[in-house]
Amino acid sequence: EIRLSLVGSEMCIRDSNMTMTIMSAAREVSALGDDTDMAALCKAISSGSLRGARGNSGVILSQLFRGFTKSIKEEQVLDIPVLTRAFEKAVETAYKAVMKPKEGTILTVAKGMSDRALELCDDTEDLVYFCEEVIKEGDRVLDLTPEMLPVLKQAGVVDSGGQGLMQVLKGAYEAFLGKEIDWTVTETAAPAGAPFAGSQETVLEESDIKFGYCTE
C-alpha cells in the first residue's frame, strides 16, 4: 500500500516542489525488487524524498516521511498504535527541521492529524474509521489555515503545502482500500488570474529550514 500510494499521490499534487519530492521517493521505491522488507522500503522512501526535496514544502514533506518511516521501519504490521506513534514522530521530526515554525502551514495540518490520531488510539480498533477520522481532521485544519495566516486569507486560499500533504494521505488511504489508481498524468496550465492555493513558501524563509540533508 505504501508503494502504491507514493506513485499515486504524485499524479494529483499541484505544488511542483512537493511533486518532485514524491516522484523522487517513488522512483527509489520502484527500484526495489518485489522481495523487499519494511526496513528497505522505509529507507527508500526517506532517502528518495530527501534527495528530491525542493523548496520548503518539499523539505518539510521529506522530514515528515523521515520521521514516519523511522518509526515504522522495524514493524511488520501497521496497526492503529503503530500509525499513531508514526504520526507523532513525523510531526516531531518536521517541527525540529524548522527553526521558526509558523502555524497555518503544512506543519499545522500534520500536527492536527497527529493529535486526532492520539485521541482515537485508545478508543477504536477500526483501522478504516481511524484513517477516515484522521484525514477528516486534516481537511478541517487545512480549511482553517487562512484564519492563521493573513497572506492566505487575503488571497482567499488555503495553504498549498497542507493541501499537498492531504493528497498524499488520501492517496495512501485509497491504496489501503485497494482502489484503482488513475495512472494518467496530465499537465494543465491555470487560466490567467486563477487563484492557486497559497504556500508556506511565502511565510517560511529558506533560512528557517535547519537542514536539507540527512544528519544521521
Where are these regions (language model features)?
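Single conserved hydrophobic/aromatic residue that forms the stacking wall/gate
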Residues: 1-8
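Short, hydrophobic/aliphatic alpha-helical segments
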Residues: 3, 33-50, 136-157
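Conserved phosphate/anionic-ligand binding catalytic regions in large, soluble enzymes, centered on
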Residues: 9-10, 14-20, 48-66, 148-174
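Regular secondary-structure segments
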Residues: 19-33, 62-69, 73, 95, ...
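Transmembrane helical cores of multi-pass ion-transport proteins
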Residues: 27-48, 64, 71-91
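Non-catalytic interaction/clamp surfaces of large macromolecular machines
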Residues: 77-192
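Accessory interaction regions appended to the cores of large information-processing enzymes
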Residues: 195-200
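Short glycine-/aliphatic-rich beta-strand segments at the starts of folded cytosolic domains
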Residues: 207-216
